[in-house]
C-alpha cells in the first residue's frame, strides 16, 4: 500500500485550483438561474412555459456536448478544449446578461451550456492526468466539492443577487470569474499531448447520441413540469430516446473507435463504480428539489433563508471530501461507498418523518450527517472508476461518468416530482401545512429507496476491487517480481 502522506507537487494543486474554479462557476450557475424563473417571468413579460426553456435549453446543450468531450480532447488537446469551454461559457454569460427578450436569453443559454457541458469532464480529465495514479484520489476529490456544493449554495447566492440588484447580475457575475479562470488556465494548465493518430469523429454515433440523450433529458424534465407520463411532450421524446440510445449502444460496441467506448464496462470495477454514481446522482440531485420546496412552501422561508437552512448538508459534504481521498487506499472505494450510502439512508429516515413544525436545529443536524454520508459515498466511487482504467482510457471515462450522473439526476428529479405532486393531490383540495409536509415525507421515502439501490453496486465494487488485487498478486507471483499496488490503492 502506498504512503498516503507522500507530498503532492504544489503544481498539481495549482492545476486543481483552475479546474475547481471553472467547475464551481458552471455548477453554481445552474442552480442560481433556477431561483430566478419567477423574476424572469415578470421582467421579460413571458409565460412561465417559455421561461422554462431558459433551463431546458441549457440542459439540452449540456447533454449534447458532454459525449463529444472525449474525442475532442484527443483530437485537439484537453487544455485547448478546456479553454474553449471557459470562453464559450463566459461569453454566453455576458450575452445572457445583455439579452432583451426571452428568445435571445434562451439562445445565449444554449451557447452557455455548450461551454458548461465541457468544463467539468475535461477539467477532471486534466486533473487526473496531471496528478497521476499516486495522487489521483486526494486531488480529484477536490473537484467533487463544487459538484456537491453547487445545489446548496446556488439558491442562496441567487436569492441574494435578486434581492439586491437586477436579474442580469446572475449572469454577469460569471464574467469576472470566467476571465480569471481563462487567464489562470493559460498560465498554469499543462500542454496536452495529442493522440499519435487522432481518431476520426464517429458521425453516426454522434447523430444517435446527440439526439437520443437530449430527447431523454427533455422528456424527463417534462415529467416534472406536467406531473405525469401521459403528455405527448413526455411520451414522444422518451420513446424516441428508447430507440436512439440502444441503437447507439449497438453501434458503439461494433465500432473500433466509437464516440464513447462502452467496452470500458467490461471492467468490473469501472462498471460497478459507474452504477454507484448513477444511483447517487438520482438520489442526490433528485432529492435536492424537495427540502428547498419544503422550507419555502411549508415553513414560509425566503429563498435566502432556505439556502442557509440547506447549508449543513453542504458543510458535511465539503468536510468529508478532502479526507476520503486518504482513506480509500486503506479500505478500497467499495467499502467506503457502502458506509456512505448506509449513513445517507439512516440520516434520510428523520427527513422522511418531517412535519410542519419539525425543529430546524434537528433538521440541520440530520442534513449535516446526510452530507457526511454523501461525501463518503460519492468520491470513493468516482476515484475507483477512474483508477481502474489505463491513462489512455480517461478521455472516454470522464464524459461517461458525467452523463450517468446527469441522467440519474434527471430520472430521480422526474420520479420525485411526480410522487410529490400526487401526494399533495391526495392530501385534499386545500391541504393543511401538516398534510403538505406529509406529502414531502412520502417523496423523501422514495428518495431513500433510490439511495438504497446503490448498496448492491457498492458490494459489487468491493468484490471487483478484491478480485483486481488478487489478479495483480497472481501476475506478480507468476512474473517473480514485486507486487504492484492495485490501481485503486495506487490512486491515493
Where are the predicted features?
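Intrinsic disorder in cytosolic terminal tails and internal cytosolic loops
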Residues: 1-11, 195, 461-492
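12-transmembrane solute porter fold
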Residues: 13-37, 44-63, 68-70, 79-82, ...
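Membrane-interfacial helix termini and adjacent extracytoplasmic/periplasmic loops
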Residues: 37-38, 104
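Short, hydrophobic transmembrane alpha-helix segments
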Residues: 222-228
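Helix-loop-helix hairpins in multi-pass membrane proteins, especially solute transporters
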Residues: 59, 66-205, 357, 391, ...
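Flexible cytoplasmic inter-helical loops of multi-pass small-molecule transporters
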Residues: 190-207, 255-259, 467-479
Amino acid at each position: 500500500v502506498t504512503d498516503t502522506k507522500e507530498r503532492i507537487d504544489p503544481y498539481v494543486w495549482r492545476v486543481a485550483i483552475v479546474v475547481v474554479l471553472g467547475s464551481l462557476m458552471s455548477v453554481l450557475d445552474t442552480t442560481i438561474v433556477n431561483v430566478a424563473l419567477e423574476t424572469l417571468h415578470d421582467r421579460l413579460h413571458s409565460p412561465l412555459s417559455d421561461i422554462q426553456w431558459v433551463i431546458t435549453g441549457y440542459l439540452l446543450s449540456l447533454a449534447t456536448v458532454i459525449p463529444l468531450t472525449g474525442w475532442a480532447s484527443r483530437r485537439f488537446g484537453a487544455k485547448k478544449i478546456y479553454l474553449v469551454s471557459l470562453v464559450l461559457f463566459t461569453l454566453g454569460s455576458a450575452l445572457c446578461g445583455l439579452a432583451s427578450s426571452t428568445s435571445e436569453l434562451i439562445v445565449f443559454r444554449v451557447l452557455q451550456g455548450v461551454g458548461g457541458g465541457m468544463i467539468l469532464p475535461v477539467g477532471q480529465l486534466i486533473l487526473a492526468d496531471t496528478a497521476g495514479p499516486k495522487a489521483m484520489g486526494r486531488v480529484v476529490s477536490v473537484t467533487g466539492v463544487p459538484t456537491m456544493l453547487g445545489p446548496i449554495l446556488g439558491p442562496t447566492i441567487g436569492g441574494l443577487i435578486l434581492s439586491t440588484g437586477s436579474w442580469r447580475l446572475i449572469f454577469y457575475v460569471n464574467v469576472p470569474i470566467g476571465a480569471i479562470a481563462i487567464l489562470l488556465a493559460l498560465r498554469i494548465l499543462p500542454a496536452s499531448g495529442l493522440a499519435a493518430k487522432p481518431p476520426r469523429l464517429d458521425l453516426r454515433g454522434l447523430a444517435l447520441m446527440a439526439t437520443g440523450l437530449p430527447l431523454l433529458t427533455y422528456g424527463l424534465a417534462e415529467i416534472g413540469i406536467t406531473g405525469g407520463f401521459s403528455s405527448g411532450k413526455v411520451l414522444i421524446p422518451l420513446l424516441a430516446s428508447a430507440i436512439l440510445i440502444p441503437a447507439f449502444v449497438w453501434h458503439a460496441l461494433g465500432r473500433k473507435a466509437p464516440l464513447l467506448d462502452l467496452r470500458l464496462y467490461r471492467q468490473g470495477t469501472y462498471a460497478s463504480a459507474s452504477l454507484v454514481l448513477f444511483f447517487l446522482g438520482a438520489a442526490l440531485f433528485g432529492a435536492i428539489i424537495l427540502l428547498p420546496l419544503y422550507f419555502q412552501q411549508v415553513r414560509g422561508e425566503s429563498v435566502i433563508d432556505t439556502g442557509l437552512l440547506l447549508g449543513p448538508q453542504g458543510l458535511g459534504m465539503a468536510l468529508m471530501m478532502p479526507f476520503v481521498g486518504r482513506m480509500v487506499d486503506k479500505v478500497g472505494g467499495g467499502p467506503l461507498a457502502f458506509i456512505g450510502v448506509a449513513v445517507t439512508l439512516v440520516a434520510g429516515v428523520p427527513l422522511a418523518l418531517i412535519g410542519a413544525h419539525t425543529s430546524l436545529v434537528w433538521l440541520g443536524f440530520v442534513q449535516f450527517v446526510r452530507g457526511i454520508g454523501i461525501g463518503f459515498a460519492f468520491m470513493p466511487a468516482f476515484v475507483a472508476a477512474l483508477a481502474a482504467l489505463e491513462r489512455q482510457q480517461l478521455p472516454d471515462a470522464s464524459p461517461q461518468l458525467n452523463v450517468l450522473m446527469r441522467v440519474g439526476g434527471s430520472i430521480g428529479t422526474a420520479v420525485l416530482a411526480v410522487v410529490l405532486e400526487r401526494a399533495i393531490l391526495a392530501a385534499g383540495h386545500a391541504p393543511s401545512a401538516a398534510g403538505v409536509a406529509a406529502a414531502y415525507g412520502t417523496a423523501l421515502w422514495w428518495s431513500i429507496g433510490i439511495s438504497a439501490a446503490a448498496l448492491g453496486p457498492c458490494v459489487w465494487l468491493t468484490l471487483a476491487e478484491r478480485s483486481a488485487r488478487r489478479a495483480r498478486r497472481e501476475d506478480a507471483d507468476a512474473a517473480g517480481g514485486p507486487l504492484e499496488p492495485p490501481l485503486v490503492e495506487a490512486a491515493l
